[in-house]
Amino acid sequence: MAIPAFGLGTFRLKDDVVISSVITALELGYRAIDTAQIYDNEAAVGQAIAESGVPRHELYITTKIWIENLSKDKLIPSLKESLQKLRTDYVDLTLIHWPSPNDEVSVEEFMQALLEAKKQGLTREIGISNFTIPLMEKAIAAVGAENIATNQIELSPYLQNRKVVAWAKQHGIHITSYMTLAYGKALKDEVIARIAAKHNATPAQVILAWAMGEGYSVIPSSTKRKNLESNLKAQNLQLDAEDKKAIAALDCNDRLVSPEGLAPEWD
């Protein structure tokens, strides 16, 4: 199954908040859900999915392996624990959340362990997140580009990450954008507002439509039904060449996610 272009993010949402967000999203027609071991919400997401009554085969569930679980003896057991929490026998996609700080666990070791998890049927696809070009090169050397379903990276109108995107595309690696709305900063942008007014759309719809138009998957999160519903409509918005050019000009390498001790040396 190809990675859905549109899904629900759950970063920073926990307990009843995430349960409500996931149940509402599934009611509205969302079918892809993105979580991670470090979000500490896999069990709540699993509960929400169970309560929603949506059949498992209709869903596309992504989780991510945390850095403490990257070694070959920990990766698969940690994924099995995630599956228990999510109340499922498999996930559709498992990502390496961040590369191992200071190369404590080699890219080769964790990518091969992740590929083994795929061979065991614990995950249908595998991929990476927050990987730079040198790290993607190592991942490809370890398991082959055909086994890397996506690189999930911070990507917004203010951080268009063109080098990484171009390199990934050249090697057949799909891009998933997180932080697409730049923590809401881009929603206040005058250029975005003008495009939104022109299309009778919301700023969020414009930005999400732009990202999907570039071929990226998006996973916006929201706790409000109104926004969840509105974001979904971004899939029907077509931007023209003028709009795309205006958004391309907003790129200013404004990176919002770069945790000290965790972030690699960015391209």
Curated annotation (Swiss-Prot):
Induction section of the entry: Expression is not significantly altered upon methylglyoxal addition.
Among PROSITE patterns, the record links this protein to:
ALDOKETO_REDUCTASE_1, ALDOKETO_REDUCTASE_2
Residues noted as binding NADP(+) in the record, renumbered to the chain: 179-231
- Oxidoreductase as a keyword? yes
Q: Give the EC number.
A: 1.1.1.-, 1.1.1.346, 1.1.1.2
Keywords per UniProt: Cytoplasm, NADP, Oxidoreductase
Gene disruption phenotype: The deletion mutant shows sensitivity to glyoxal.
Function, as annotated: Aldo-keto reductase that significantly contributes to cellular methylglyoxal detoxification by catalyzing the NADPH-dependent conversion of methylglyoxal to acetol. It also exhibits fairly high activity with glyoxal and probably plays a significant role in detoxification of glyoxal in vivo. Shows broad specificity and can use aromatic aldehydes such as 4-nitrobenzaldehyde, 3-nitrobenzaldehyde and benzaldehyde, and phenylglyoxal. Also catalyzes the reduction of 2,5-diketo-D-gluconic acid (25DKG) to 2-keto-L-gulonic acid (2KLG) and could be involved in ketogluconate metabolism.
Identification of the protein by name = Methylglyoxal reductase DkgB
Per the UniProt record, the source organism is Escherichia coli (strain K12)
Instruction: Supply the gene name.
Output: dkgB
